[in-house]
Amino acid sequence: MSTLPLMFKKEGLVEKHQVEGVDPSDRYFNRAVLVNRTTAGYSAKVMYEALTVESGSHSTIAATVKELVEKLQGFGFTRMRTRANFKGMRYLAEKETWIDYNDRP
């Protein structure tokens, strides 16, 4: 990973978020979400067992993570929430506020 400050970094991993909730088999899970800067903005990726889900590019990290959660919900994941755990190489010590996402009807 580059040691450039995030504001100067053109592409690559810029943040790691944590996503947790309940999978389609009704089991609790948590995984790391990798947020990358791309030429078009930000994209995110998460892997869960054999499933890999990626967002499209968005202008904000919040929109990117939200799309990723919505895609997981489309596969049957519920009670989802996320928070940032790393900004660049800096660990946020689990002090960031959780963002809860409403389940789909």
Q: Which role fits each region the language model picked out?
A:
Residues 47-63:
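A short, exposed loop/beta-hairpin motif centered on an aromatic-Gly-Thr core
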Residues 1-45, 100-104:
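N-terminal segment of the canonical double-stranded RNA-binding domain
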Residues 60-105:
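Mixed-charge, Lys/Arg-enriched low-complexity segments
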Residues 11, 20, 40, 55, ...:
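Feature targets compositionally biased, intrinsically disordered low-complexity regions
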Residues 17-19, 55-58, 97:
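Generic detection of short hydrophobic beta-strand segments and adjacent strand-loop junctions
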Residues 8, 17, 37, 52, ...:
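Compositionally biased, low-complexity repeat tracts
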